[in-house]
C-alpha cells in the first residue's frame, strides 16, 4: 500500500497472508469469507502456498494466529463473454476450518453492488514504495475512491468495453495498492466489493487508478462452489 498508515489491529481480522512454502516469502493477501474459505486473486496461485490468518506484525506472533494449507483451489474458468481481465479471482478451501477469535473473523460477501463515487478501504502487506519494493512488517490501510470503469479504460486502452472489473484509486496520485497487495480486499461502505488485481508497473501515479475484480458479479460462482457444486456453469 502506497501512502497508507498501519492498519488498526482490529480492522483486518478477515485479512489473510499467502506465502510461498519453499522460499517462505510473502506473496499476496486474501480475504476470509467464512470458516473455511478464502477469496484471493487468481494470479496469486502458486503450486505451494500456505496461509496465515490472524496476523498483524509478520515478526510478532499472536496467540490465536493460525496457519493453513489449501485443500482445494478453484479458478474462474469461464471463457465465453469473459476476457483474461475478468478472471482474476480464486477460491481456496482451507485444509481445516478456523474459529473466530480476537484476530480472526470472516468478512461477509456483498449484499448490494458497489456505487461509483464510494470511498473504499484497501489494506495489505504489499510494498510501500514503487517501483522499488519495500515490504512492511505490518499491514497498511488507506482510503481510495471508486471510479467509473471508463476512467480505467481511458488509462488502459486494452481493457474490454464491458467487464467485471472495478476501477479505484486517487486521481492526485500518491495513494494506491501495489505489488503484493494483490488478492486483498477492497471494502466500500463496509461491503467487500473488490479483490486487488492489477495496475501500472509504477503504483500511485496521478490519474492512473488500479483494477479490482468485482466480487458482486461473481457471487453465483462463489456461492455455488462453497455449496459443493464443483462444476459450476458459467453465468
Swiss-Prot record:
It comes from the Eukaryota. Gene3D superfamilies: Trypsin-like serine proteases. Keywords: Blood coagulation cascade activating toxin, Disulfide bond, Glycoprotein, Hemostasis impairing toxin, Hydrolase, Protease, Secreted, Serine protease, Toxin. Expressed by the venom gland. Its main location: secreted. The keyword tRNA-binding does not apply. This is Thrombin-like enzyme bilineobin. It comes from Agkistrodon bilineatus.
Amino acid at each position: 500500500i502506497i501512502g497508507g498508515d498501519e492498519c488498526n489491529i482490529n480492522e483486518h481480522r478477515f485479512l489473510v497472508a499467502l506465502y510461498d512454502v519453499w522460499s517462505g516469502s510473502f506473496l499476496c493477501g486474501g480475504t476470509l469469507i467464512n470458516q473455511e474459505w478464502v477469496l484471493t486473486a487468481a494470479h496469486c496461485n502458486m503450486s505451494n502456498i500456505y496461509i496465515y490468518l490472524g496476523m498483524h506484525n509478520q515478526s510478532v506472533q499472536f496467540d490465536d494466529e493460525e496457519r493453513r494449507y489449501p485443500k482445494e483451489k478453484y479458478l474462474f474458468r469461464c471463457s465465453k463473454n469473459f476476457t483474461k481481465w475478468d478472471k482474476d479471482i480464486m477460491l481456496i478451501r482451507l485444509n481445516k476450518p478456523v474459529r473466530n477469535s480476537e484476530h480472526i473473523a470472516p468478512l461477509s460477501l456483498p449484499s448490494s453492488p458497489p456505487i461509483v463515487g464510494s470511498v473504499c478501504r484497501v489494506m495489505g502487506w504489499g510494498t510501500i514504495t514503487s517501483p522499488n519494493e519495500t515490504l512492511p512488517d505490518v499491514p497498511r490501510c488507506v482510503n481510495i475512491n471508486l471510479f467509473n470503469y471508463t476512467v480505467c479504460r481511458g488509462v488502459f486502452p486494452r481493457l474490454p468495453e464491458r467487464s467485471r472489473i472495478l476501477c479505484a484509486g486517487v486521481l492526485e496520485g500518491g495513494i494506491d495498492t501495489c505489488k503484493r497487495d494483490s488478492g486483498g480486499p477492497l471494502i466500500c461502505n463496509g461491503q467487500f466489493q473488490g479483490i486487488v488485481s492489477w495496475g501500472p508497473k509504477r503504483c500511485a501515479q496521478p490519474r492512473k487508478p488500479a483494477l479490482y475484480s468485482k466480487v458482486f458479479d461473481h457471487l453465483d460462482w462463489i456461492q455455488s462452489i462453497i455449496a459443493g457444486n464443483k462444476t459450476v456453469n458459467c453465468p
